[in-house]
Amino acid sequence: MKYDLIIIGSGSVGAAAGYYATRAGLNVLMTDAHMPPHQHGSHHGDTRLIRHAYGEGEKYVPLVLRAQTLWDDLSRHNEDDPIFVRSGVINLGPADSAFLANVAHSAEQWQLNVEKLDAQGIMARWPEIRVPDNYIGLFETDSGFLRSELAIKTWIQLAKEAGCAQLFNCPVTAIRHEDDGVTIETADGEYQAKKAIVCAGTWVKDLLPELPVQPVRKVFAWYQADGRYSVKNKFPAFTGELPNGDQYYGFPAENDALKIGKHNGGLVIHSADERVPFAEVASDGSEAFPFLRNVLPGIGCCLYGAACTYDNSPDEDFIIDTLPGHDNTLLITGLSGHGFKFASVLGEIAADFAQDKKSDFDLTPFRLSRFQ
């Protein structure tokens, strides 16, 4: 059998692509080295932020707004346990922060619902937060967080129900490009398709070693917190920049545990074996202490944590491009630790590619040619 589309890597983007392409009527094969959702990539840990006024650059705003529409649609499949939670996101940092300047610019350009607060305004609204006098907050009322593993599970189930073939726990060992399509090699045999999507995350270089993607081991952890920090008490998700430039992110507490992680830094690794579990690196449990001590002093001890992996591009912007010399293969990689919120729209872009549809978005900033 020859498929219309083979998806290599069925984590966040791959799961979405499988659903949207199958729903569009294509004959699709989803593959993954493990059984998604799983603990081997970048999507585990239950939650991911979604921010609209994007501090990483205005070029992302059209993508994230479309992503939000698709997340809202997906959430309707899980109304008892919604995939998207509109908690709001407060972005904290010094008044001269370049990141916050980008947030403000994105909000202005796209007329997004963002409220600016000074330090006193932040602490009056959320007494649990402490910031210096020179800090500001940009509060995104319409943003919040996503339940990442539930989203992937839902997409995979919906794709399967729509007739998508799924080959999991079976790594792709090679990709061959031929005149009439793409062939993948697996322990289960060879499979052919007219087109392929490669969204294999951290270990994409195992298949395509020429790609400029660097795996980085990252950690996040849950700390003891009471009901004051919960969504029910209107405590928001957050990003926070310390005076030294370190960037943190976190979520409202659930079950008396607040999740927080540090966005920058991490341990460069070169193989999956190097991504050791949480707490096997001495600094894992204390990485968030500088932020907690200064900004959230009421949070308690570290309860537990997890390690994940970023697939960083050299400039930490996405790579969305066809494989050089092979227009029938689309790469979506280098998501650099800020990609999950875009998984829905990236999956839709992949499905459009498989149907020979022109994308509605300007993807020029994400081309591989920028690294030449």
Curated annotation (Swiss-Prot):
Matches recorded under InterPro entries: FAD-dep_OxRdtase, FAD/NAD-bd_sf, Me_Trp_Oxase_MTOX, MTOX
Keyword Metal-binding among UniProt keywords: no
Cofactor descriptive note: Binds 1 FAD per subunit.
Modified-residue entries (S-8alpha-FAD cysteine), positions: 308
GO molecular function: flavin adenine dinucleotide binding; N-methyl-L-amino-acid oxidase activity; sarcosine oxidase activity
Residues annotated for FAD binding in this entry: 4-34
Sorted UniProt keywords: FAD, Flavoprotein, Oxidoreductase
SUPFAM superfamilies, per the entry: FAD-linked reductases, C-terminal domain, FAD/NAD(P)-binding domain
Cofactor(s) essential for the protein: FAD
Transmembrane regions listed in the UniProt entry: none
Catalytic reaction equation(s): N(alpha)-methyl-L-tryptophan + O2 + H2O = L-tryptophan + formaldehyde + H2O2
One Gene Ontology cellular component annotation held by this UniProt entry: cytosol
Gene3D superfamilies from the UniProt entry: D-Amino Acid Oxidase, subunit A, domain 2, FAD/NAD(P)-binding domain
Entry's family note: Belongs to the MSOX/MTOX family. MTOX subfamily.
Classification via NCBIfam families: PRK11259.1
Assembly information from the UniProt record: Monomer.
Known role: Catalyzes the oxidative demethylation of N-methyl-L-tryptophan.
The name this protein goes by in its record: N-methyl-L-tryptophan oxidase
Species of provenance: Shigella dysenteriae serotype 1 (strain Sd197)
